[in-house]
Amino acid sequence: MASVNIKPLEDKILVQANEAETTTASGLVIPDTAKEKPQEGTVVAVGPGRWDEDGEKRIPLDVSEGDVVIYSKYGGTEIKYNGEEYLILSARDVLAVVSK
């Protein structure tokens, strides 16, 4: 995972989607047109967090760079940067962190 010059704002998270499965458990090859959009990815960058209600302290996020996360199927904004595809998600679109 290369370093990226994109710094998310507030509670936003930059994720690079993990590759979708290319074969089934029985060995059948899945064509690109039939693959489901992946819902798992690696966190590349994390914003500093939202401000609290008083505007005095930032509320830190529950994820950090390098975490593998599962995110909402339709959440986030897809972007392309330096030939790579990324997803910018709000912290609320992250459903779980996968344990290593």
Swiss-Prot record:
PROSITE patterns: CHAPERONINS_CPN10. GO terms for molecular function: ATP binding; metal ion binding; protein folding chaperone; protein-folding chaperone binding; unfolded protein binding. SUPFAM superfamilies: GroES-like. One of its GO terms (biological process) is chaperone cofactor-dependent protein refolding. Transmembrane segments: none annotated. Gene3D superfamilies: GroES chaperonin. It is found in: Cytoplasm. Keywords: Chaperone, Cytoplasm. Its main location: cytoplasm. GO terms for cellular component: cytoplasm. Belongs to the GroES chaperonin family. Heptamer of 7 subunits arranged in a ring. Interacts with the chaperonin GroEL. NCBIfam families: PRK00364.1-6, PRK00364.2-2, PRK00364.2-4, PRK00364.2-5. Together with the chaperonin GroEL, plays an essential role in assisting protein folding. The GroEL-GroES system forms a nano-cage that allows encapsulation of the non-native substrate proteins and provides a physical environment optimized to promote and accelerate protein folding. GroES binds to the apical surface of the GroEL ring, thereby capping the opening of the GroEL channel. This is Co-chaperonin GroES. It comes from Mycolicibacterium vanbaalenii (strain DSM 7251 / JCM 13017 / BCRC 16820 / KCTC 9966 / NRRL B-24157 / PYR-1) (Mycobacterium vanbaalenii).
